[in-house]
Amino acid sequence: NKPRSNIETVNDLDGDVVNLFECIRRDPERLGRLVYFTPYSRETYEATYLSEIPKDPFERAARFLVKCNQGYGFRTNEVRVGWKRDIQGRERAYAARNWTELPEGIFQAAERLRGVQIECRSAVGVISRFNAPNVLIYCDPPYVLSARSGGKRQYKHEMTDRDHLELLAALKRHQGP
């Protein structure tokens, strides 16, 4: 919800995340329609792990959204974590309802991504490239593995302790606020 800056860049090493952003920006109606007509179902979720990765970028983005939103923990790696379902006794149903609200979220994201540059590079490389006093960096790396319950891997591109130290050094060198 922040106001736009003159130059904005979004970066993620995960090509599926970048593909999702590109599809949202290029044709949010098409992606929204795909999600709208995709059922919230265990079989749909399971199929994302059993089928080949679609060549069509919009089908690939919809598949990625199913994995992230219909499974527990929003994991982006290829580890199946189980289908997220609503159960009796909770204060409200949320899993299926959140899925039905996702197409509207796609349109909101499309509006926000207008004019934004999308990168798929290492965070250290992007931070170095944008090292200027008037550049604000918002950095949201994966948690350190040792700080996670059981050291579970969640992301397609995890960071080692050394990677975290390199990122910290790059952020400390950055001239901006």
Identify what each model region corresponds to.
Residues 8, 12-16, 131, 140, ...:
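Acidic side chains
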Residues 25-138, 142-152, 166, 172-173:
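SAM-dependent nucleic-acid methyltransferase catalytic core
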